[in-house]
Amino acid sequence: MQFIKSLIFNIFLYFGLIFIFILAIPTLILPNKVTIFFGRLSAKYIVLILKLVMNTKVIFHGEENLKKVDNFFVASAHQSMFETFALQIPLDGPIFILKKELLNIPLFGWYLRKIGSIAIKRETTTKENLNFFDKIKERLEKNKRPLLIFPQGTRVKLDEQPPFKKGVGRIYKALNLPCIPVALNTGKVWPKNSFMKFSGDIHI
């Protein structure tokens, strides 16, 4: 039964996202706020099918903390693909710091470029690092939106606790902005690299 539910969910997930991304193609030449709308729409769509197909409820905690500061960046745990979409709901179109490879994915990568996402290289020189921080500052001043980074660098299993990458500390020092950490349990419902999805509440 769990396999059947997972199969139905994945069909709705991928075909639904492809449909939304195709609808969003014209937004690539429109203002960012229109593109961001479709990003949040895709997140809400996933939340909906999680509820309808998997009987999974998504609960956001601490959203009031986002209103206490004007400028900040968010450092989130990373257990599944889901939070890359879901965090667009409370953050309303964050600026992603992500692996360069993600920008090369058709449709998805185009959207990430349009909303001002910043690619990070695994191995960088000191000069490249300085240019990277300058780019972040410029992007934040221009867009007035929060920065979102996944300091673990990749998705991890629910019971794993790999060390955080040093980059988040460097960003914290370079930007001199408050950091809002995000804990979650998405790996319980949506395990890393797994076809199977499971029922249960998601807490972010």
What name fits each language-model region?
Residues V53-H61, N129-N131, G187-V189:
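Short gly/ser/thr-rich secondary-structure transition/capping motifs
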Residues F21-N32, I36-R40, V53, K68-T125:
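Catalytic core of membrane glycerolipid acyltransferases/transacylases, capturing the structured
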Residues N71-F73, K144-F150:
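Residue-level preference for the first positions of well-ordered beta-strands
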Residues R113-K144:
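A membrane-cytosol interface segment of integral membrane proteins
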Residues F108-W110, P146-L147, K157-I204:
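A cross-family acyltransferase "interaction/gating" segment
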